[in-house]
Amino acid sequence: MRVSGRPMLLALLLLLSTVGDRGRAQSRGPADRQTLLRLLVELVQELKKFHIGDSKRLQLLGESDFALGRREATDYGADQEEQRVEIVPRDLRMKDKFLKHLTGPLYFSPKCSKHFHRLYHNTRDCTIPAYYKRCARLLTRLAVSPMCMER
């Protein structure tokens, strides 16, 4: 938890001024005032050093960690083929089981097999596991379409 130095400094000054002369019968001399002043100045300097240290720590974690270096900046976006994400097909039996679980048994007539294969093997919805629910919906719509209902 971070506490600002000013309220703490004001609290110390208030505390020192209220204690005052209770413990002493005689008034303070100039030497006591100088030591009190020196103590307060040292306290303020320590607080400043503490805050400067905090700001340096925050600065170290700041922009310099996330900035691209000269070499990284030139490599970024250099070759489009290297940045292309290659989707590795998962186990095709698992894909088939999952889609059968979502759709139930589907029948496609021979007239519709070309459309089925295009949809099943070439669309994003049926090749990326995150979109299998969309694929199941598309396959059921294809299966009940008038073109595919004929046997």
Curated annotation (Swiss-Prot):
The keyword Signal applies. Keywords: Cell membrane, Cytokine, Disulfide bond, Membrane, Secreted, Signal. Residues 1-25 form the signal peptide. Belongs to the ALKAL family. One of its GO terms (biological process) is positive regulation of ERK1 and ERK2 cascade. It comes from the Eukaryota. This is ALK and LTK ligand 2. It comes from Mus musculus. The gene is Alkal2. It is found in: Secreted; Cell membrane. One of its GO terms (cellular component) is extracellular region.
